Amino acid sequence: MDFPSRFEVIVIGGGHAGTEAALASARMGVKTLLLTHNVETLGQMSCNPAIGGIGKSHLVKEIDALGGAMAMATDKGGIQFRVLNSRKGPAVRATRAQADRVLYKAAIRETLENQPNLWIFQQACDDLIVEQDQVRGVVTQMGMRIFADSVVLTTGTFLGGLIHIGMQNYSGGRAGDPPSIALAQRLRELPLRVGRLKTGTPPRIDGRSVDFSVMTEQPGDTPIPVMSFLGNKEQHPPQVSCWITHTNARTHEIIASNLDRSPMYSGVIEGIGPRYCPSIEDKIHRFADKESHQVFIEPEGLTTHELYPNGISTSLPFDVQLQIVQSIRGMENAHIVRPGYAIEYDYFDPRDLKYSLETKVIGGLFFAGQINGTTGYEEAGAQGLLAGTNAALRAQGRDSWCPRRDEAYIGVLVDDLITLGTQEPYRMFTSRAEYRLILREDNADLRLTEKGRELGLVDDARWAAFCTKRESIELEEQRLKSTWVRPGTAQGDAIAEHFGTPLTHEYNLLNLLTRPEIDYASLIAITGQGCTDPQVAEQVEIKTKYSGYIDRQQDEIARLRASEDTRLPEDIDYAAISGLSKEIQSKLGITRPETLGQASRIPGVTPAAISLLMIHLKKRGAGRQLEQSA
C-alpha cells in the first residue's frame, strides 16, 4: 500500500503537545498523521523527570478528563507520588509525580501506536504548503508533499534552537537532537510576530558518586495518590525517595566569580528565561541576600543511576558546573554524566491566535506548546489537546471549542496567552485562576468529561466509569440528606463525644457534614454504610463543606456570563468607534479580541471603553435589523 498523500490533520512534533494533539484528533475519528524527526523520542521528558505540581496537576487532570494520555502514562511511569498543599484547601491541592523517563515514554508510545486513525512517520517538516492564506499541507525533509485540512505545529524548543554551554554555542533542538532551521525560516516569512525565549537544564549526576547520608530524605505519600481518574496504585512501578540538599556560600562564590563566563550575563543569550524556574546564576544574582537555595535530588528512573539536581539549572562552562556541583553537601565527589545547558528558540506571539489556537492569518494552521511562549510539559499537553481537537473539528466542519476561564485551567491558560501575550515563558499557577474553588483538580472530570464525550474525545470505558461516579455522588448526597440523627440516641451521643459537638436538635448527615470539625470518614464510621470509593467520598465532602462559597462563585460567573460571551465581529473597525482613545483603539486593533469579555482583560482597556463597545454593538445590531426590514 502506498503511503497516504492526504490526511485530515497533520501534527508536527512528538513531544507533550504533539502527542496529545495527535491522539485527540485521532480519537475524534479524524485521519491524523504525526510527523516526528525521531520516533524514539516520542513523549520524551526533555527536562525534569516529573509531572504535575501547583497549577500544573490541574491541567493534567483536565487533559485526563478529556481522554488524554498524560495522567495515565504518569500512573504507569510514576516512581514517587505526593500531594502538595495537602493541609490547605482543596482549590490549591496538587498531585506531583516523579516519573521514570523510560517508563513514561514507553507508556506514551504504546498509547500512540494503539490509537486507531493515527499514522506515525519519522520525517522532519521543512516547509508548509500555504495557498490563499490557508494551509494545505507540509513538505518533509526528503521533499514529500503531504496534504491536510489542518496542520498543528508543536515544535518545542527546536525552531532555530541554539544550545549554550559557557561561551560556546551550537545549533540544536535539545542535547543530542538537531534543530529545525528550514521550518523556522519559513515561519518567519509569515505575517506573525516572532521572538526568542530561553530555557535551561541542570547537569545530570551519577547517583553512585553521591553521599545521601548527609541529605534529607523526601519519601512519597502513603497511601500512594494516583494521577488519572481511571488510574489505580496497582499500575505504579516500585516507589523511591527524593533527597534534599542546599547550595552554600562557597557555591554562590563560585557562581559570582564566573558570571563573566555566563552567556546569560555576558549578553550572548538574547532570549528571556522562565521567571519561576530560574537558573542558579539568576537565583544568586536576584536573591543575593539568601545564604542558600534548596536542591532537590530527583531519580531519573529505576534502571539508571542518573539523578536530576532540581534547582541548579545552568549554562556556565563545564569546569564551573563541576565546581558548583562538588561544592554542594553530599556531592563533593559527584560525577557529572551530562552537562547542563541553556537553549534559545523561536516562539510566536500568542496574541496572533484565536481561542481555538488557530492562527488569525493562516486558516487551518494551529500552534501548541512552547511555540506559544509557554514552559512545562503540562501546559504543552493542554494546548496540544485543545489544538488537536479544534483541528479535527475544523476538518469535520464543526465549530471550534475552548473552555471558558470559569470552566477549566485550560481556558485560563489560553485566555491569558491570546489576550495578554507573554514576554517570558508562561507557567500555570492556581493564582492565575479567579474561580479556583470551582476549578479544583479533583473535579476536572465533573467539569469536562461530558463535553469531551460530546466532542468525541472520551471513549466508552471512560464514559461508563464517569457516569457511575457521577451517579454514586448523587446517590450518596441523597442518602446523607435523608439520614437523620437525633440527640439522645446512641448515634447522636457518639457524634457529640467524637467531635465535641453536642446535638441541639435533629440533623441530617449532610447538614452535619457542613460543620468544619466533622469529616466524612469519621461521620460514616459512626453512622455506618457510606461510600467506599475515595473519589466519590471526596466529592461529597468538598461539595458539602464549601457549598456556600461555591454557590457564591457560580452566582458571580452567571452575572459576568452575558458580557463574557458577547461576540465581537471580526470586521469591527475600532478606529471608527467614537469615544475610544487612540491607545485603546490600537490595543483592540492589535489583539482583535473575539468576545467582550476578552476585550475587558486587555491591559489598559477601561470599563468605559467596554461600555462604548457595548453601545456600538447595540447600534450595529439595530442598524442591521433596519436594513433587513427595509
UniProtKB/Swiss-Prot annotation:
Superkingdom field: Bacteria
Classification via InterPro entries: FAD/NAD-bd_sf (IPR036188), GIDA_C_N (IPR049312), MnmG (IPR004416), MnmG-rel (IPR002218), MnmG-rel_CS (IPR020595), MnmG_C (IPR026904), MnmG_C_subdom (IPR047001), MnmG_C_subdom_sf (IPR044920)
Gene Ontology molecular function, alphabetical: flavin adenine dinucleotide binding
Sorted UniProt keywords: Cytoplasm, FAD, Flavoprotein, NAD, tRNA processing
GO biological process terms held by the UniProt record: tRNA methylation; tRNA wobble uridine modification
Places the protein is found: Cytoplasm
Cellular component terms per the entry's GO annotation: cytosol
Record: residues binding FAD: 13-18
Signal peptide range: none
NCBIfam families recorded: mnmG_gidA (TIGR00136)
Family the UniProt entry places it in: Belongs to the MnmG family.
Official protein name in the record: tRNA uridine 5-carboxymethylaminomethyl modification enzyme MnmG
UniProt source species: Pseudomonas savastanoi pv. phaseolicola (strain 1448A / Race 6) (Pseudomonas syringae pv. phaseolicola (strain 1448A / Race 6))
Classification of source organism: Bacteria, Pseudomonadati, Pseudomonadota, Gammaproteobacteria, Pseudomonadales
Name of the gene this protein is made from: mnmG
